[in-house]
């Protein structure tokens, strides 16, 4: 990236143009100057100072599924460079490590007293079956590094897992790390996702797990087969989604104490934009299981929500830009 253009802007670090549309629209509607930086490949001059502005990272742990396996380490390099020059980042260097590791997420959540699923971390697929022996059943497997339900499968026994691996039906994780995890039974077939931007609660949504399964990405692009344009049957879903049906719904009037606990968690971890997901069980548990730091927003939810997620991000970043560069107002 060249620093020839010195006007301060919001620099958006990302790798998936399919997810950027709502944010582009929000920036343009609010008159916020921005520049996309697609971290797919490129050249980084460590001796050149970064251009003026605020840097917002939206790199996803699922980047490798789009052929962008280099994006993760490229982003780490860019964020190290930005930190070295004192640039202001949003969801910066620490955040990308939490985004890339569910082990990191779960250990940090547990350290702050959240109820998280019983989990066993397995490095090397050849150790999975042995690790599953004696683990409470049913259980799920999950990739440490990923999103969109990557590697999530439900098994009723270690023998069933062994058969799946032998048949070639177990997808190898990108970083070689799998999670064996308690299958948390929800009181209703839904999970809740809490959206927080700049330490403010924006809204909460529910996701229908009967139709959404383990793939609960709110972005509209996640629900469509990119080749055929047909609705996908997500892994773990028990009901085929149909045109006109909505997996996501606004959870109106949500005012749970967990909101303030999530805000405190994000402050402690230095995360400024996130969606955190939890399951409520019939016996009263509130089980937090995922922290999404490159959060997407669903168009149907946005149409009825009291606040816009992308709009709130545009406003938050614009305020940071104005504070950092008052002469540019």
Task: Indicate residue ranges for each PLM-predicted region.
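Short hydrophobic segments within beta-strands
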Residues: 12-13, 197
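Protein kinase-like catalytic core scaffold
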Residues: 139, 202-203, 274, 287-289
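Short glycine-rich anion-binding loops that position phosphate/pyrophosphate groups of nucleotides
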Residues: 60-63, 144-146, 294
